[in-house]
Amino acid sequence: MMKATIVLDAKGLACPMPIVKTKKRMKDLKAGEVLEIHATDKGSTADLEAWAKSTGHEYLGTEAEGEILRHFLRKGGEHSSENASSIPEISLEAFKQKVDSDESLNILDVREIEEYEKAHIPGVVHIPLGEVEKRANELNENDEIYIICHSGRRSEMAARTMKKQGFKKVINVVPGMRDWTGKTE
């Protein structure tokens, strides 16, 4: 069992709230201290792991206790960055106009499989956030790629991961599928 400096209750919250609360709480920690996050959202494991990696914090792991996931993150040192290099964004409205008029868009949906199966934009590539680092090579790093999730948080983390891997034209769709009114499958 890991020891934490601070415990954060994010039980019952859906994406992006566990990340939002974690980001705020990390500011209260000193470098090297550990934050324990209690969550019930199954997607929180991949979300927190990717967020920690993209901001210079250390993801230590997750312990499950029934429905509760106990995530552990160690605050990074002076080189950690909450907002490392900006990622270009497109509004959902502007993105929908592109989808409606252009059949050749490259769209990556990084939501969990359950979310994707409920409804997704026709023709998207689906790679859950937790698999983006390993599977990004399935995409062409020189293509313009629009990345979408539920709210814009996970897609931003995926874009950061892909940018570090050499992708040059990744664009985060904000706010994401929660407000999507276009065609779905």
Swiss-Prot record:
Family: Belongs to the sulfur carrier protein TusA family.
InterPro entries in UniProt: Rhodanese-like_dom (IPR001763), Rhodanese-like_dom_sf (IPR036873), TusA-like (IPR001455), TusA-like_sf (IPR036868)
Domain Rhodanese: 101-185
PROSITE patterns linked to this entry: RHODANESE_3, UPF0033
Record CDD domains: RHOD (cd00158), SirA_YedF_YeeD (cd00291)
Organism of provenance: Bacillus subtilis (strain 168)
Gene3D superfamilies per record: Rhodanese-like domain, TusA-like domain
Superkingdom of origin: Bacteria
Name listed for the protein in its UniProt record: Putative sulfur carrier protein YrkF
One protein family per Pfam: Rhodanese
Active site: 15 (cysteine persulfide intermediate)
